[in-house]
């Protein structure tokens, strides 16, 4: 009897092991822990856009056609006037035409200069700038940006930009033919602007009361962050104001505040799973869905509709000695064709792989799938939010 009992015990152990493996296989995967700096940001710690208008000179005959872009000529005249160089407003014959208007320059171009002022930037720090053509310049390659003030939204000058441009494209033209690789009307100057004014430190003005803003609104993630912060720094350190904003009580001293923020940003939190969502790009026909999308059983019938318009010229020749004229007319033929669309069963999908397999079984194009997904959503078969961008 002992061998029989041992065999039964081994069989029971094997069944228990198999049950555990099946439970692990079908159990939902645990959310991966992420650093807090990847989930949220401190309110007030952000970049500030800067913009300016200037001139690029030194172009090899590829600048603005100044007769067609009067603002380029006007800007050049103002710049020369600031340098103490005056341009005669009358012609040599005493006519009324302006010398500024008659200037035909090919080596200068009007440009817009943009930059991003990082948080806590100090005077003397160098930042990168992007230079983009404003007129009809063919290329900015080899040009030099003249001194350009960069202003913020408040109208104050925060940086000064100047330097030689780096353009990633290349091109050549001759006898009406032209070859171009990449973009020639924009370039970049690494470290081309010097910060002249700093933005007031918003964090220092909060007196130790900071607000943490989640990148994506989620009440569950906000609650998990509050629990993680309070467990690490003590109860009452973090309080959730809503699904996106968390209020923090930080040290008022700047040195202690830096240590607090460094430790805070490295906390690991497991965020809640994102809501099921399908993104439809109406311009490119792209469809993107996350792993939470599921399908219910449904039947789909979709037939392609095609319209063909064929236009051919028809020559009407008059009879002999009729004093008529030969006339060319256009004759159009329109054909409307619709393919037969039979009902196809779309099986339910509990995960992303099954959803993709079910949609691929329809054999529809991305443009057709956009209409099918919208119809599935209306019928209640698609368990996800549709967003068209």
Curated annotation (Swiss-Prot):
GO terms for cellular component: bacterial-type flagellum basal body, distal rod, P ring; outer membrane-bounded periplasmic space. Residues 1-33 form the signal peptide. Transmembrane segments: none annotated. One of its GO terms (molecular function) is structural molecule activity. Keywords: Bacterial flagellum, Periplasm, Signal. GO terms for biological process: bacterial-type flagellum-dependent cell motility. It comes from the Bacteria. The keyword Signal applies. It is found in: Periplasm; Bacterial flagellum basal body. It holds the Pfam family FlgI. HAMAP family: FlgI (MF_00416). Belongs to the FlgI family. The basal body constitutes a major portion of the flagellar organelle and consists of four rings (L,P,S, and M) mounted on a central rod. PANTHER family: FLAGELLAR P-RING PERIPLASMIC PROTEIN FLGI, FLAGELLAR P-RING PROTEIN. Assembles around the rod to form the L-ring and probably protects the motor/basal body from shearing forces during rotation. This is Flagellar P-ring protein. The lineage of its organism: Bacteria, Pseudomonadati, Pseudomonadota, Betaproteobacteria, Burkholderiales.
């Amino acid at each position: 009897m002992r061998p029989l009992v041992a065999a039964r015990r081994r069989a029971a152990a094997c069944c228990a092991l198999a049950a555990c493996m099946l439970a692990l296989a079908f159990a939902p995967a645990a959310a991966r822990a992420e650093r807090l700096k990847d989930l949220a940001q401190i309110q007030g710690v952000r970049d500030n856009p800067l913009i300016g208008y200037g001139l690029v000179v030194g172009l090899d005959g590829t600048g603005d056609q100044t007769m067609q872009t009067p603002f380029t000529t006007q800007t050049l005249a103002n710049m020369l006037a600031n340098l103490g160089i005056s341009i005669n407003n009358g012609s040599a014959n005493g006519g009324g035409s302006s010398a500024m208007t008659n200037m035909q320059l090919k080596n200068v171009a009007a440009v817009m200069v943009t930059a991003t002022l990082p948080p806590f930037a100090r005077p003397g720090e160098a930042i990168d700038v992007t230079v983009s053509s404003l007129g009809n310049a063919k290329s900015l390659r080899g040009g030099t940006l003249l001194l350009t003030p960069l202003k913020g939204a408040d109208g104050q000058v925060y940086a000064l930009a100047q330097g030689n441009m780096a353009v990633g494209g290349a091109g050549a033209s001759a006898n009406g033919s032209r070859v171009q690789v990449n973009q020639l009307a924009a370039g970049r100057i690494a470290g081309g602007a010097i910060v002249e004014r700093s933005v007031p430190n918003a964090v220092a003005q909060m007196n130790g009361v900071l607000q943490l803003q989640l990148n994506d609104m989620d009440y569950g993630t906000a609650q998990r962050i509050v629990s993680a912060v309070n467990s690490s720094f003590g109860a009452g350190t973090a309080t959730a104001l809503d699904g996106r904003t968390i209020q923090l009580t930080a040290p008022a001293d700047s040195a202690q505040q830096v240590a607090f923020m460094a430790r805070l940003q490295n906390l690991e939190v497991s965020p809640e799973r994102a809501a099921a969502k399908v993104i439809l790009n109406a311009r490119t026909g792209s469809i993107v869905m996350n792993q939470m999308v599921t399908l219910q059983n449904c039947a789909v019938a979709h037939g392609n509709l095609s319209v063909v318009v064929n236009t051919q010229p028809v020559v009407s020749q008059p009879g002999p000695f009729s004093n008529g004229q030969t006339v060319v007319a256009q004759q159009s033929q329109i054909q409307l064709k619709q393919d037969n669309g039979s009902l196809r069963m779309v099986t339910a999908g509990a995960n992303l792989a099954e959803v993709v397999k079910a949609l691929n079984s329809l054999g529809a194009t991305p443009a057709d799938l956009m209409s099918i997904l919208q119809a599935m959503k209306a019928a209640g078969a698609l368990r996800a939010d549709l967003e068209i961008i």
